Curated annotation (Swiss-Prot):
SUPFAM superfamilies given in the database record: Band 7/SPFH domain
Quaternary assembly: Heterooligomeric complex of flotillin-1 and flotillin-2 and caveolin-1 and caveolin-2. Interacts with ECPAS.
Phosphoserine PTM sites in chain numbering: S19, S163, S385
InterPro entries (alphabetical): Band_7, Band_7/SPFH_dom_sf, Flotillin_C, Flotillin_fam
Keywords, alphabetical: Cell membrane, Endosome, Membrane, Phosphoprotein
Subcellular compartments: Cell membrane; Endosome; Membrane, Caveola; Melanosome
PANTHER family referenced in this protein's UniProt entry, alphabetically: FLOTILLIN-1-RELATED, FLOTILLIN-RELATED
Protein name: Flotillin-1
């Protein structure tokens, strides 16, 4: 049959085939009924309130001490567990705690007897360490380990600790008064010194402040110069950058315009090509057809005109021949007339010349006075003497006509007056 236990207890199996007994702390074990026996022992931690009443210390002063200890049976160490089983197997936790408490109290009393009240009161850590050390070495033989020990309380019935406190309090108060007086004295000295140091520090501080102000103003002036220089450089750089940016923008704009212009040119070229094709489809081909038609019409008209011209030329030729025949007949008649005039001239000579001159004289007079007939307006300017108005014009015309014989004589060499006064001669 299997038996189990928790980590806070141990099982001890003894009997048939179990020599020495088997000890299991926190686990399971197989037990043969009737021929084997199983017992349990607690491994719980036990809290002990260790009181030592009216124990005389090294100087014979009785005091009472209370300590708190934590102890337990050690289950991890087989030897300590075996010792605990030999001593406490079958006992309850209360019985085990009582045994451990009696042991600890004895060791606590022993340590108190070897120490003074002042040592126990002032150095509790030392007292606790000594009790823990002595009790642990004794309880380990029982299989019990001391987990911790602390001194909880110290008191006495003789007011020793209170008197010790009074003396200490009086000493402390005395030291406090002395310290207070010395402190006041030192405080006055320190106050005066502090005032002196304060004034000196104030002067030094003002000097340092003046130096700092001077250094600040110098550094600030240098900083302002540097800042203004950097700001001017930054402004100039900004303006340069703005100018460069504007230039780049302008270049980009020009490039865009060039591209747009190129695109427009390409579009225009495409439009021109399209219009040329459209023109060729709408105008050129019909024009070529019209031209061919006109050429054909012109050729037909040309042939017609040639035929008309040939007919007119034939008509003109025949008319010319007729006119030539008429002119020839007229010329023959005029020649006969001229021959007769020549015969008459030969017969009458000067009389014939005079007759010819007189016959042509009106024509000559007409040609001489021709410019006057084309004048639309005549303006007469008088010098204040002589005739005026139409009489003046008539006189001028008569004067021109009176000079006609002279003109004829200069042109022909024949004097009308001489011919007129000579007697007519015949051949």
């Amino acid at each position: 049959m299997f038996f189990t236990c928790g980590p806070n207890e141990a099982m001890v199996v003894s009997g048939f085939c179990r020599s020495p007994p088997v000890m299991v702390a926190g686990g399971r074990v197989f037990v043969l009924p009737c021929i084997q026996q199983i017992q349990r022992i607690s491994l719980n931690t036990l809290t002990l309130n260790v009181k030592s009443e009216k124990v005389y210390t090294r100087h014979g002063v009785p005091i009472s001490v209370t300590g708190i200890a934590q102890v337990k049976i050690q289950g991890q160490n087989k030897e300590m567990l075996a010792a605990a089983c030999q001593m406490f197997l079958g006992k309850t936790e209360a019985e085990i705690a009582h045994i451990a408490l009696e042991t600890l109290e004895g060791h606590q009393r022993a340590i108190m007897a070897h120490m003074t009240v002042e040592e126990i009161y002032k150095d509790r850590q030392k007292f606790s360490e000594q009790v823990f050390k002595v009790a642990s070495s004794d309880l380990v033989n029982m299989g019990i380990s001391v987990v911790s020990y602390t001194l909880k309380d110290i008191h006495d019935d003789q007011d020793y600790l209170h008197s010790l406190g009074k003396a200490r309090t009086a000493q402390v108060q005395k030291d406090a008064r002395i310290g207070e007086a010395e402190a006041k004295r030192d405080a006055g000295i320190r106050e005066a010194k502090a005032k002196q140091e304060k004034v000196s520090a104030q002067y030094l501080s003002e000097i340092e402040m003046a130096k700092a102000q001077r250094d600040y103003e110098l550094k600030k002036a240098a900083y302002d110069i540097e800042v203004n220089t950097r700001r001017a450089q930054a402004d100039l750089a900004y303006q340069l950058q703005v100018a460069k940016t504007k230039q780049q923008i302008e270049e980009q704009r020009v490039q865009v315009q060039v591209v747009e212009r190129a695109q427009q040119v390409a579009v225009q070229e495409q439009e021109i090509a399209r219009r040329e094709k459209e023109l060729e489809a709408r105008v050129r081909k019909p024009a070529e057809a019209e031209r061919y038609k006109l050429e054909r019409l012109a050729a037909a008209e040309k042939s017609q005109l040639i035929m008309q011209a040939e007919a007119e030329a034939e008509s003109v030729r025949m008319r010319g021949e007729a006119e030539a025949f008429a002119i020839g007949a007229r010329a023959r008649a005029e020649a006969e007339q001229m021959a007769k005039k020549a015969e008459a001239f030969q017969l009458y000579q000067e009389a014939a010349q005079l007759d010819m001159l007189l016959e042509k004289l009106p024509q000559v007079a007409e040609e001489i006075s021709g410019p006057l007939t084309s004048a639309k307006k005549i303006t007469l300017v008088s010098s204040g003497s002589g005739t005026m108005g139409a009489a003046k014009v008539t006189g001028e015309v008569l004067d021109i006509l009176s000079r006609l014989p002279e003109s004829v004589e200069r042109l022909t060499g024949v004097s009308i007056s001489q011919v007129n006064h000579k007697p007519l001669r015949t051949a």
